[in-house]
């Protein structure tokens, strides 16, 4: 019997959990995250559309932060990219020079706009 080390076993299990397709996006992009919520027997989809502040990690633990403003109240949510209960749709590409645009937290209104990246 072949002996497998712990890390190889972990990698093997994680590989099965990864999504087959994840859209390519980065900080500054506008995405729509459709979250499947199960309420008793009923399953409903809640959309969360906003700007990606950061994408970090790799493999099964890769995450990203999305920020949106609703009625003047800013909301930020952390999502796991390979979560089977979410689907990610890229709305538009944003032009930023940083991997983590934390300065967007202090901005509101017109100052919070991000230029669109040309293809």
From Swiss-Prot:
Annotated GO biological processes are:
translation
Q: Which PROSITE patterns match?
A: RIBOSOMAL_L19
Pfam family membership, one: Ribosomal_L19
Which Gene Ontology molecular-function terms are recorded?
A: structural constituent of ribosome
Query: Which family does this protein fall into?
Result: Belongs to the bacterial ribosomal protein bL19 family.
Q: What does this protein do?
A: This protein is located at the 30S-50S ribosomal subunit interface and may play a role in the structure and function of the aminoacyl-tRNA binding site.
The protein here is known as: Large ribosomal subunit protein bL19
């Amino acid at each position: 019997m072949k002996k497998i080390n712990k890390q190889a076993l972990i990698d093997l299990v994680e590989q099965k959990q990864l999504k087959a397709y994840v859209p390519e996006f980065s900080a500054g992009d506008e995405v729509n995250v459709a979250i499947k919520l199960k309420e008793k027997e009923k399953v409903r989809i809640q959309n969360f559309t906003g700007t990606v502040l950061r994408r970090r990690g790799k493999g099964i633990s890769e995450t990203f932060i999305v920020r949106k403003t609703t009625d003047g109240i800013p909301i930020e949510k952390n999502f796991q990219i390979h979560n089977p209960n979410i689907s990610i749709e890229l709305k538009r590409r944003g032009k930023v020079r940083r991997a983590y645009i934390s300065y967007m937290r202090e901005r509101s209104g017109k100052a919070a706009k991000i230029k669109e990246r040309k293809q």
